């Protein structure tokens, strides 16, 4: 018995007239008056289900086959034949059906064969991968992750695993989840009444990381080209379609590189992974184009063939002011560009992906390299039509004296960053990197509007059910 995935049968990799077995779940069952049942069987290996044609001559036809409902798990053995019907090239002429698992009560099965609202699916996140939408998202997520690893491997980067528990606040924003084993009912106190974290597990305050960047820089300053790819955490009380408390980040870091180098790297990487999705997941992308966002495929195709525009922040502000547009957030030099500003630049003005660079120092993090004008830092954002910011990056401040000035200006204790400062004391080099939120990337590719629907189990304010 040859067990094969559904995708192998549908794509002709299982020989016609060969007998194979597929294992999966029933999506639908349709019975004809001629005593034949048609089962749509899916196993997640591709978007489309496989049609299994079941004759009433099978010994368990009356007692089992006719009682199969959506969600039942089965094992189908049969002969691969060319399909006379529309919708698939091949189907399975069943010679045996084995029921592996029944649905207890089909009437109350949360994933009954009908369209469900996206809000309802979040309430049954443990079952929602069985839907067309979330199944397609999961496969695209996988393909993007594999393409990211492949891109960096092919370009000489090393993957570095940075810690999830940290004592450093990379962004200096303070929106971090605390990690502690102290007894909340009996907290140890210092003489001044503050919580005594010296008695905690790590002997100091510890948090879930907001970024692997600082740790990544240490390896870039030894291996030259590295990237991190893992979960990060933000304790922002933001209930928006763009925010998660737990999300995944890709963060490359390159030694002997400047802002122009990583802007070029960002463009190459995005085009590479988008092309991978177009090459490998067209069945899922067609579903997104039909049911979610009609521009899904065309958007990626335009992106991979577009030249990125580049503009200084100062010029971008001038463009926005001169546009005559009325923005919800007024535009002036020194503001952090909002999503509406970013989308105007990418969609209306440049009509292409755009790199905005050299932002005011007061709205950026302490580690970004001060420019010669003393007012701006060598930071960049990549803005994409349809979403706005998709990547944020910078050249890092490699001069110890300037870094110390920035830490002091932002009210951060430089002794807390002693190991980070050591990189500037022992063979410092110019280096640069960026961060890419993986869920925002998936949302952009699929057209799914809310990042809660592109991660298996979203963590948001007041929600950690599963």
Swiss-Prot record:
Keywords: Aminoacyl-tRNA synthetase, ATP-binding, Cytoplasm, Ligase, Nucleotide-binding, Protein biosynthesis. Its EC number is 6.1.1.22. Gene3D superfamilies: Bira Bifunctional Protein, Domain 2, Nucleic acid-binding proteins. The keyword Membrane does not apply. It comes from Serratia proteamaculans (strain 568). It catalyses: tRNA(Asn) + L-asparagine + ATP = L-asparaginyl-tRNA(Asn) + AMP + diphosphate + H(+). GO terms for cellular component: cytoplasm. The lineage of its organism: Bacteria, Pseudomonadati, Pseudomonadota, Gammaproteobacteria, Enterobacterales. SUPFAM superfamilies: Class II aaRS and biotin synthetases, Nucleic acid-binding proteins. PANTHER family: ASPARAGINE--TRNA LIGASE, MITOCHONDRIAL-RELATED, ASPARTYL/LYSYL-TRNA SYNTHETASE. It is found in: Cytoplasm. One of its GO terms (molecular function) is nucleic acid binding. It holds the Pfam family tRNA-synt_2. Belongs to the class-II aminoacyl-tRNA synthetase family. Its main location: cytoplasm. Homodimer. This is Asparagine--tRNA ligase. It comes from the Bacteria. Coiled coil: none annotated. GO terms for biological process: asparaginyl-tRNA aminoacylation.
């Amino acid at each position: 018995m040859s067990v094969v995935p559904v995708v192998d049968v549908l794509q002709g990799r299982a020989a016609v007239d060969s007998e194979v077995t597929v294992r999966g779940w029933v999506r639908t069952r349709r019975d004809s008056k001629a005593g034949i049942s048609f089962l749509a069987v899916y196993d997640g290996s591709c978007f489309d289900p496989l049609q299994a044609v079941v004759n009433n001559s099978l010994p368990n036809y009356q007692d089992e086959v006719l009682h199969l409902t959506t969600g039942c798990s089965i094992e189908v053995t049969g002969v691969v034949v060319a399909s006379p019907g529309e919708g698939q090239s091949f189907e399975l002429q069943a010679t045996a059906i084995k029921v592996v698992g029944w649905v207890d009560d089909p009437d109350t099965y949360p994933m009954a064969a009908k369209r469900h609202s996206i809000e309802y699916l979040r309430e049954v996140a443990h079952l929602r991968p069985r839907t067309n939408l979330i199944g397609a998202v999961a496969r695209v997520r996988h393909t993007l992750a594999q393409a990211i690893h492949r891109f960096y491997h092919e370009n000489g980067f090393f993957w570095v695993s940075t810690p999830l528990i940290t004592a450093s606040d990379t962004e200096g924003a303070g929106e971090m989840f605390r990690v502690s084993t102290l007894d909340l009912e009996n907290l140890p106190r210092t003489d001044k009444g503050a919580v005594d974290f010296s008695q905690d597990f790590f002997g100091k305050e510890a948090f879930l990381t907001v970024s692997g960047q600082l740790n990544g820089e240490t390896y870039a300053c030894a291996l030259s080209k590295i990237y991190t790819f893992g979960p990060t955490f933000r304790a922002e009380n933001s209930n928006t379609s763009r925010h998660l408390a737990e999300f995944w980040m890709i963060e490359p870091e390159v030694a002997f590189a400047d802002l122009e180098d990583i802007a070029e790297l960002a463009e190459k990487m995005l085009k590479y992974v988008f092309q991978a999705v177009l090459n490998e997941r067209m069945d899922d992308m067609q579903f997104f184009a039909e049911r979610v966002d009609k521009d899904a495929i065309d958007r990626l195709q335009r992106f991979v063939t577009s030249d990125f525009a580049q503009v200084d922040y100062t010029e971008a502000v001038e463009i926005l002011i001169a546009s005559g547009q009325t923005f919800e957030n007024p535009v002036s030099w020194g503001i952090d560009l909002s999503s509406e500003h970013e989308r105007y630049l990418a969609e209306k003005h440049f009509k292409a992906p755009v790199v905005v660079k050299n932002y005011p120092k007061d709205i950026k993090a302490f580690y970004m390299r001060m420019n010669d004008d003393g007012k701006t830092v060598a930071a960049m954002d990549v803005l994409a039509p349809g979403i706005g910011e998709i990547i944020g990056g910078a050249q890092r401040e490699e001069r110890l004296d300037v870094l110390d000035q920035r830490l002091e200006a932002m009210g951060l204790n430089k002794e807390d960053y002693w190991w980070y400062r050591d990189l500037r004391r022992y063979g410092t080099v110019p280096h640069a990197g960026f961060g890419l939120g993986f869920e925002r990337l998936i949302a952009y590719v699929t057209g799914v509007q809310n990042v809660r629907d592109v991660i298996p189990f979203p963590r948001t304010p007041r929600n950690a059910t599963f």
